[in-house]
Amino acid sequence: MSWSWQRRWCGGIEAVIFDVAGTLLDFGSCAPAGVFVEVFAAEGVAISLAEARGPMGAEKRQHVRELLFSPAIAARFAARRGRQPDETDVDRLYAAFVPAQLACLARYGELVPGALETCRVLRARGVKLAANTGYSRDMLEVCLAEARRQGLELDDAVAASDVPRARPRPAMCLLNAARLAVSDVTACLKVDDTVPGIEEGLAAGMWTVAVAVSGNEVGLPLAEWQALPATEQARLRARAVDRLARAGAHLVADSVADLPAAVAAIEARLARGERP
């Protein structure tokens, strides 16, 4: 007879790790998308907002790379330049992206509605609050300053430039968890609006909650979202929910305003001995 033993964390959620743009602040994740369009346009290569949003969640140099080497955009680049793109083009585009992104981040720094109250509720329950992001450290610091200005202080924050390889690999989440000194990775919850961010949380062995409406999948500023007819809101929400659920998110919510209920649902699953 053979035996196998499994350890299970049956306590509650000890830490929530938020993505930044489209999750904690910048409803619609608008800051990065527009800059990618502008940077490629300056090279004489037109890309759509939908194309710019495709790799969202990735480290920003990698985001540039994935855009540039996608078949459709690479073909446009070749038609313009008479050659295929290479890594020197990635370097040049990223070098143009960084100052443009830094220049506009504060304009998109408003917290997602409900974010501050959600964080207050979680703190009152003893939950630690952290963030990680596809932004570089300099970009993240601008976002953190905007969050602090509105009354939100986090316990830890990791930028994509802080780790050797970022999303969808788990390094940022694991660094957050280590610095927060959590009991177990299954006591952590990753909240994100992108597929790479959800995949990152899953790779780290954590619970994941995707936010569908406030983030990249719908991709609209708050005022534009609120102005839509209910039928169009329902269509866009359903499309976003389907994509994020297919990425493996344990739960999908509209925004971080819904997170306390999601945490309660996950804690009930933990109490039953379930694992991510």
Model-based region annotation:
Residues 1-14, 116-124, 136-276:
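Asp-based, Mg2+/Mn2+-dependent phosphohydrolase catalytic module
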Residues 23, 133-135:
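Conserved phosphate-coupling serine/threonine residues in phosphotransfer and NTP-handling enzymes
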Residues 28, 133, 212:
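Glycine-rich, histidine-containing beta strand-loop boundary motifs that form or position
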Residues 3, 9-116, 120-125, 141:
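N-terminal helical cap/lid subdomain that shapes the substrate entry/recognition surface
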Residues 89, 107, 132, 164-168:
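Short, well-structured alpha-helical patches and their helix-loop capping segments
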